[in-house]
Amino acid sequence: MNRTNRSGVIKGGVIGGKEQAGQWKIDARFNRKDIGSRIEKFASYKSRVTLHGQDALALIKKLGTSTPANTLFYLDPPYYRKADKLYDNHYKPADHAELAEAVAELDRPWVVSYDDQPEIRTLYSAFRQEVFGINYSAGPVAKGSEVMIYGPKINASGSTVSTWRGIAA
């Protein structure tokens, strides 16, 4: 569903608008063949992957250490900046701080991705961080930056983000 709205953000609306009168139509990012092949590739890992569509903090509290030791937590919380304009359910600064504390105590490998903001870098300052550029193509074309934050049990060297991008493409 991420590909049917504006960068996965519900309040942004669908690409091209409800009337599909914009320059970009819904199929600009919803390429059936490409998405189908990605789903098939991902499906080959289905016995090893569990997806949870819930709040990151609630997930950590619910699962925490009850998962196998080799469980990787990948958390993608709402953006820090402009969240109230992008999401129906967004975090307040105190929620981001509470999540950072819970993640720091998590005894499992973890990775968190965020919009690159000084407040986020400070909250996760004890952990390795990798900033990377991102092109926003829905709406006005713009460049931004995001940050990947790696827990102490993640053993990676070099630019992990560029490696992941190669796999995901």
Label each region the model flagged.
Residues 1-74, 78, 82-84, 117:
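SAM-dependent nucleic-acid methyltransferase catalytic core
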